[in-house]
């Protein structure tokens, strides 16, 4: 699986069962990155996308298998780490209140790409791509 997540400075993903932030340029970049592939999301996550023709909405995205793209906002829905071959981390470069955190230790993964870009509502968003070469689908 190709996992996409957004985190704040302390790896927080949610607060009080809500996403911490969102950004329209980040969403556009995400859809461009996956090309013609579908993006698997929860019903909650789907609400932030205007163009939903590339989305597949699932209640249980962590059950996915194979070389699929999945954007997960709630860390309680993260798949087992041994099913993930790529992680794309978008960093807000801000501190937000958090009570749910990204739990995968990225130090055990290979950082293969690092880019910064200006978002619509964020001056700087960092995109990091990590690979687990032992699990390439």
Name each model-derived stretch.
Residues 1-137:
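Enzymes that bind and transform nitrogen-containing heteroaromatic metabolites
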């Amino acid at each position: 699986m190709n996992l996409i997540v957004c985190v704040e400075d302390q790896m927080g993903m949610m607060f009080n069962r809500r996403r911490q932030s969102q950004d329209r340029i980040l969403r556009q970049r995400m859809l461009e990155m996956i090309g013609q592939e579908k993006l698997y999301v929860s019903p909650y996550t789907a609400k932030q996308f205007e163009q939903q023709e590339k989305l597949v909405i699932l209640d249980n995205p962590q059950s996915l298998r194979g070389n699929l793209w999945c954007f997960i906002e709630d860390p309680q829905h993260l798949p087992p780490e041994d099913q993930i071959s790529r992680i794309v981390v978008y960093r807000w470069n801000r501190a937000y209140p958090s009570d749910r955190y990204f739990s995968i230790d990225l130090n055990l993964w290979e950082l293969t790409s690092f880019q910064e870009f200006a978002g619509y509502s964020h001056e700087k968003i960092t995109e990091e791509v990590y690979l687990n070469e032992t699990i390439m689908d």
